[in-house]
């Protein structure tokens, strides 16, 4: 079922770029793509998906759905057909291997628990170091029986009946909320998830598209989601919109490269995902948004970006859930701003594919940018356009977003910058190299 993916590995260098220009179509959204495989695999009927992000992480979710009994077919670039199981997974013959996909494994834990199926969940070294109790604990309250390795992978799930719960996640996490809601589809009774701080709502939107009845009540920055089970998903077409998190790299590259003028087409426009654009505009970015067509129940936009003189700001901690994946590349923008950019409320970055808070600070220091690292904060002293020395090498710690950020910082620096490995970029954005090259960026493999 797997298409051929672009495979590049080893160190890479980014040279200072001339003005970036041109138009690219944003890559398919990773969050929507994961959910398309999981919901399509669980649904009754055939789900046809277009625009799917064919990255390593997403493909691992597709493989898991196939191992659980769904029929998954690749019809062409980004085009897939999923014949679902009608709410009845089959016990897989081998562990479900999610590689580096935290979203995939956490959501699938909920989806499998809700069907009463038993399964083993494994991942690579990076994923196996990430916390899973944030998902297994609430699923356990519903009746799922997990055995984990110190709260991490490998994990075993013994299938059994579930009951609805009222749950307030201790952290703002769309993955936790989604795992509970997916389990609630097969649970008896009503499940209520109360979010003190609203997170991305793709699961709620897509569940409705698949015929699920649920309610969402918002109260300021909080939200309460209510779902009564059991319910069966009914297959529907999914046209995946562009990924705001992946689009961030080209946006920042254009902002820091004098004379640049680029457009990204078809990017998802969801308030729970647009925190970076809001932040960059507050920093002085020349960004124009034009409405695009609705896709997968989401609004989209075309983003026009021109090189800009940026200035430091304080990013509200309450904005972190809407841009948690974009902080490494925001650090790049902050490096080229005038003044200090303060970023509080970043404790969740410590538990990503790597310690992204420490990794982002190390990337900046390696390239001559002053930064203060707190327990849950960063303060970046910007050096202005053309003022970043560059010349450093970013240690990626197998983290795709650190790798891409470590390359973008070199596009506007005085000297070329490099990263120690690029192999993991395929987990989220296999077209990154082609897109940057199309816009005029200079990326060179190092031997």
UniProtKB/Swiss-Prot annotation:
Task: Give the residues the record marks as binding 3-phosphoshikimate.
Answer: 30-31, 35, 173, 175, 325, 352
Superkingdom of origin: Bacteria
Q: Which reaction does it catalyse?
A: 3-phosphoshikimate + phosphoenolpyruvate = 5-O-(1-carboxyvinyl)-3-phosphoshikimate + phosphate
Any single GO BP term: amino acid biosynthetic process
Q: Which Gene Ontology molecular function entries are recorded, alphabetically?
A: 3-phosphoshikimate 1-carboxyvinyltransferase activity
Q: Looking at the keywords, is Glycosyltransferase present? A: no
Q: Active-site positions, per UniProt?
A: 325 (proton acceptor)
Q: Which UniProt keywords apply?
A: Amino-acid biosynthesis, Aromatic amino acid biosynthesis, Cytoplasm, Transferase
- The UniProt annotation places phosphoenolpyruvate binding at 30, 102, 130, 175, 356, 401
Please give the InterPro entries that the UniProt record associates with this protein. Enolpyruvate_Tfrase_dom (IPR001986), Enolpyruvate_Tfrase_sf (IPR036968), EPSP_synthase (IPR006264), EPSP_synthase_CS (IPR023193), RNA3'P_cycl/enolpyr_Trfase_a/b (IPR013792)
Q: Where is this protein found? A: Cytoplasm
The terms describing its cellular component in GO are: cytoplasm
Q: In which pathway does it act?
A: Metabolic intermediate biosynthesis; chorismate biosynthesis; chorismate from D-erythrose 4-phosphate and phosphoenolpyruvate: step 6/7
Region Disordered: list its residue ranges: 1-22
Return the EC number: 2.5.1.19
Its subunit composition reads:
Monomer.
State the PANTHER family in the record: AROM/DEHYDROQUINATE SYNTHASE (PTHR21090), PENTAFUNCTIONAL AROM POLYPEPTIDE (PTHR21090:SF5)
The protein's job, in short, is: Catalyzes the transfer of the enolpyruvyl moiety of phosphoenolpyruvate (PEP) to the 5-hydroxyl of shikimate-3-phosphate (S3P) to produce enolpyruvyl shikimate-3-phosphate and inorganic phosphate.
- What is the similarity comment for this entry? Belongs to the EPSP synthase family.
What's the protein name? Answer: 3-phosphoshikimate 1-carboxyvinyltransferase
The coding gene here is aroA
């Amino acid at each position: 079922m797997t298409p051929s993916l672009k495979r590049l590995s080893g160190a890479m260098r980014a040279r200072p770029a001339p003005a970036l220009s041109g138009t690219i179509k944003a890559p398919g959204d990773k969050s929507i793509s994961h959910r398309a495989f999981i919901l399509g695999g669980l649904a009754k009927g055939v789900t046809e998906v277009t625009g799917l992000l064919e990255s390593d992480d997403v493909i691992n979710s597709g493989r898991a759905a196939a191992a659980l009994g769904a029929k998954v077919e690749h019809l062409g670039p980004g085009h897939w057909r999923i014949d679902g199981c009608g709410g009845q997974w089959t016990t897989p013959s081998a562990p479900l291997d999610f590689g580096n996909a935290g979203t995939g494994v956490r959501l699938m834990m909920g989806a499998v628990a809700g069907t009463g199926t038993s399964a083993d969940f494994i991942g690579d070294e990076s994923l196996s170091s990430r916390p899973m109790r944030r998902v297994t604990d609430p699923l356990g309250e519903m009746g799922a029986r997990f055995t984990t390795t110190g709260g991490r992978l490998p994990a075993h799930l013994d299938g059994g009946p579930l009951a609805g719960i009222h749950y307030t996640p201790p952290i703002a996490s769309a993955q936790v909320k989604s795992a509970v809601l997916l389990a609630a589809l097969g649970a008896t009774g009503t499940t209520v998830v109360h979010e003190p701080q609203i997170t991305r709502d793709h699961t709620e939107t897509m569940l409705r598209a698949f015929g699920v009845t649920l309610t969402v009540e918002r109260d300021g920055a909080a939200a309460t989601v209510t779902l009564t089970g059991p319910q069966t998903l009914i297959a529907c077409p999914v046209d995946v919109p562009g990924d705001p998190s992946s689009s961030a790299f080209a946006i920042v590259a254009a902002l820091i490269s004098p004379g640049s003028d680029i457009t990204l087409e078809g990017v998802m426009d969801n308030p729970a995902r647009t925190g970076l654009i809001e932040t960059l505009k507050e920093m002085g970015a020349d960004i124009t948004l034009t409405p695009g067509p609705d896709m997968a129940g989401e609004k989209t936009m075309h983003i026009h970006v021109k090189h800009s003189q940026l200035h430091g700001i304080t990013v509200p901690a309450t904005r972190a859930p809407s841009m948690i994946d974009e902080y490494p590349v925001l650090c790049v923008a902050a490096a080229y701003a005038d003044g200090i950019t303060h970023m509080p409320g970043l404790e969740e970055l410590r538990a990503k594919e790597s310690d992204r808070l420490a990794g982002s600070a190390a990337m900046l220091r390696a390239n001559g940018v002053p930064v203060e690292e707190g327990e849950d904060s960063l303060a970046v002293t910007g050096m202005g356009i053309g003022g970043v020395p560059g010349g450093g090498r970013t240690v990626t710690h197998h983290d795709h977003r650190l790798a891409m950020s470590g390359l973008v910082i070199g596009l506007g620096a005085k000297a070329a910058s490099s990263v120690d490995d690029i192999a993991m970029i395929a987990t989220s954005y296999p077209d990154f190299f082609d897109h940057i090259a199309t816009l005029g960026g200079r990326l060179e493999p190092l031997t």
